Amino acid sequence: MNRTHMPNNHKIHEGINMKSSINEVKKSKRIEKELSYVTNSTKKKSKKKQTNIKKIGDVSVNIENINIPNNLNLYTDNESVVSSKYKKKKKKKKKLNIYNNNDNSKYLKPQVVKKKNSKIIFLHHNENNTSTHSGESSKFQKLKKKKKIKKGTKKKSINKISILKHKSHESFPSTQNENTPELEPKQVNLSPLEIEINKTNDIDKHGLEINKTPSTQNFNDPINNLDNNEKIKDRGLFHGIDNIYENYITNDKENMQSVIKNRHYIIDKNEQNEQAYNNDMNITNFIKNGNTNKNSNNDKSANSNDYNKNLFCELTEAIENDGIEQTCNRNINIRLKEEKEAEEEERKKNEDEHILENGKSNNEDNSFDKKDDLTNLGKSFKNNESFELNSPQKNIRKGSLDGMRKKKISEKKMKTKIKQKKKRQNNINDTTIGKKKIYIKENNNERKSSGLILGFKKMKKKLSGKRIDQKKEYKEKEIYSDKLKDVIKDKKKYKKKDIDDISFTKDIVKENVKGVDRDDDEKKRKTIGQDEEKEKIEIIIVKKNETGTEEEIKVETDENPKVKTKEKCKIENGEGCKIAIDEENSVFVEAENMKNEAKLEADVIIIEDAELRKDEEEDKSKNNEKDSKSEERDILETQMAGKEEKPVLKKKKKNKGKQRNREGKGVVEKGYDAKREKKENEEKNKANTKMEPNDSIEQKDKLSNVQNMSNIVKNNKVNKILEKYIISKKEENLKRKYMNTKKFMDILDISEKKFKIDTINFFPHTIGQVCYSDIYFFFDTYEKELKKSNTGKNTIKLMKKLFKCEYIEMNNMELILQIFDKIIDKLKKELKTESIVKIYDEEEHVIASKIMKYKNGNYDKYMYNKKKYDSNNEYSISENNLFNQNPLHHQNNLFGCNRNKLYNIIFNSSQGEYIMGSHSFLILQQWNDEYKLAMLRDKLEQIKKRKQNMNDPIAKYIKSLKYGFIDSLFSICCLYDCKKNDNDASYCDFPLPSQNTFYTNTQIHLDNMNLNSERILPMKITKAVQILASS
């Protein structure tokens, strides 16, 4: 094919400045002279030289420019031949040693020229042994003959690179074959080069390496692909080159395939003489950057005057080439278009042929893509018209690039669609009808789905996964089929319950099932008939084992029964697949539902029809009965009231017309719609049948419902409070483990808390119950609203707080009482089985022993009193116990005290006063929490009375306050009325609870004593009052 010439791109370096105007005048004159020589020489000489070089596999050239110019070493690997010419300022000749690895004895002597222009010839692989005509060689020879005339001149010639392909090794350029006749150019396959540049500190020491390897990058990539290490800082004045890259395109398929194979297997892995470079570069980048850097680096070693002369010589030749080559490019573009149109037609034909063919390998598929890559190399040359004569840079039209991109995208889409069709046919079934063979591939990873059992898409994804043994797969299929059968049986049992009552539905079910069976039999007969028409068919089943090997199993289907048995087995396993063979192209696998599923659908439709009919009949019967009853009741009511009879409006019967229309259209109503209509009709009928109750009864029911709801809400609140108590006690127990045993925490200290705390002590009644500790509960019903947090212990302040009980809501008071009641109920059940209490540091047995010593010490006094008073005396032991508080009769009683002492103990006592063995400790030990609850209930009754008397005048209100104050004092001390005391009407005893009597046996007395098992301060009555007084 014809060669295409790339226009030269020239770029001016901004860092160089001219010396003076005198030098510029001299240089312009030299340019004019050289232009005249060039034009004359082109007209006279038309003959071009040609060289034929032997076919070479891999070419890699390493050129090392060293400070000493005499040393030049060219190394080649694997049948490589390199010829180069290097010269110095002197007129000495330089010979080149060309080494061939295959033939160590052969040395070739290329042509040696006396002139100073240096030329490097890069040799490429030539597969077809074709010869080409190089335009560059003719131009170089013209310049040589010019410079023979001017031997006295000391101009430094231009360093150039020419890329050639020649026929054989024997016709290497020498003195003998310079004047060989011209040969016509032939089709040549060119593979791209990858050029690597290694930048060193010294510009003269510059290494260049050229490897013929397959380049993945496009040839039109910009210069910015270079890494930072590859960018060259010092460039010449004009950044360009005169030589031209030759791009050859072919239409022959055989040549294209051979080039592709060689592109992948060119580089030798065991190259030792080459340097390893990490960065690659395209040919275009090398043409733009590589040679200019080399020229600039080599020229800097010479004088500055010679350096500038060579640059202007490059400028003159570039101007000529731009004018000549652009005209050539326009003619070449017309040829390229014609050639590409022919190529596209051939390409379409080839694609149609490959679609019909099957069994191609993946390597051949990839070859089509690589052919397209080579043919698309010429697309960048379509835009040559966009290059301007004097433009330093390449300007590409955007419209042309967008068009090419769209074409590429459309071509890729078509290719992907074609490949997908091939894969489906190859993976599922590869058939060749002419040979009458069927290839069916069965993979072990296939899993059945409910809708489509084969699952083509899932099969492709799971091919790369782990393989499953055939035995496991067979077991899974059996398990799956058994489950389906069980589910079907359950559904039938559930739905036959409604069908048993109706006789006519059974006949309908049988008819539908028979119809389904007939359809299935007809389909089977059709498939079997097609098989009979055809002759012997070989079914080859390809199974892939874990090792990757394939096993072929041939089955001759001369007899139809064998095929039938396979189909039956599949249907029993739940697959339900049928294979239908088409005469044209391939086997299509169609997944069908099982017989059982078809039966179920028929059953569902019939059962729904039966349910609707039942519902309609029941509605009719009920409506008729209710209408008759409602009419009779209306007549009775009118007779009792003496009113005239009113016409009774019958209800409209709905859903009859709608159901008929829906059934006509083929729509089946669902069961739950009919049930909803039933419920609505029943509710409406019940509302009519109910008699209107009396107003009084309704009001009572409403009140009872309201009370029940309020009780439920309160119970929920109580449960929440108790849950909070359990959580807080766990936290406190953790803290107290690390506390000192001597220091006791004040539980009632509420300075740092947002809620009020109260404690209730539940004391054990016998010594056997000492192991159970006391229980402490707290309540957060009332938030702290008082401004003064530190309240004193004076009695006046406590009395004032009692009057604030009127401002407390009644619901909150009732809630407290419910909490107390619930606590007591729990104690009766759980106190003996669980310890839901906090346990203090000091041991229980030690405390109990101290109490027993105190009691045994007083045993002598007890016996003295027993002798003094006989059993017949009116003051017997049963009457005169330790807890009798009458000072008139028992002045020497240890536990006798008056009202003031008890009052002081309750209100003005401190922790230091409660020492083990004191009378006040023992008295308060006997105090029971039931009295506290009674006090709270009494207080509630007082508050209710006060609210009722709020509307009375002020005088009555003040009196009620006085009496209320007195009552509160007595309630605090828990005193009885004076009238109840028979001994003295002016004196009120202290009726402390649980008065125990002494018996003759002291051990019985000790077992029945009420004791406090732990050294804990008992609760004051004032703290119980705080529940009421808190606000």
UniProtKB/Swiss-Prot annotation:
Disruption phenotype: Both female and male gametocytes appear normal and fertilization proceeds normally. Meiosis is normal. However, ookinete maturation is delayed. In A.stephensi mosquito fed on mice infected with knockout parasites, the number of oocysts in the mosquito midgut is reduced. Residues 141-168, 649-659 have a biased composition (Basic residues). Residues 125-184, 340-405, 609-697 are annotated as: Disordered. Keywords: Coiled coil. Residues 581-646 form a coiled coil. GO terms for biological process: development of symbiont in host. Residues 171-180, 377-394 have a biased composition (Polar residues). Residues 340-357, 610-648, 660-686 have a biased composition (Basic and acidic residues). In the mosquito vector midgut, plays a role in ookinete development. This is Ookinete maturation protein 1. It comes from Plasmodium berghei (strain Anka). The lineage of its organism: Eukaryota, Sar, Alveolata, Apicomplexa, Aconoidasida. The gene is OMG1.
